[in-house]
Amino acid sequence: MISGSPQNHKKPRPNLRAKWGQAIEAIAPGFKVENVGEGGVVALKSFRNEKAVQTHPLDKKTPCSLKRQLQVPKGKSSLLKIRCSYHPHGDWQLRVLANSKVLHDQIVSFKTVKSEWLEVEVDLTKFAGQKIDLALENRPNDWRNEFGFWHSVQVIHR
């Protein structure tokens, strides 16, 4: 039996979004999280012997996304570096988009990674002098343990 107003049970905890934002900021500076699904955003002290943040797609059609606007500087090479992993009994689709254009698309699983962590590098230099909308998607592919684990997301300009 539930006591009190049913509406109160539907409201998210007041600081939940702030906690999610802090967890994402710790591993992906400048990024915000959208469309968070099962389990929310969970900061883990140790996953595969590394600190990590766990995400999950909102539903079968809506990926959980890490997003930010990025001014890509002229006269420098720019590189997006991602270190991510998968649930031991699942997999997920990693997509990297700039201005809604897919730059990288890969299944993250034991079969494709062959180790505990996937290292991805995406060259952003072609966007030099532009402000881009950058998105990293934890996209569902078969809806079995689609948890994404993020160790680090960095944008490097040299």
How would you label these PLM feature ranges?
Residues 2-158:
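Gly-Asp-aromatic-enriched flexible segments
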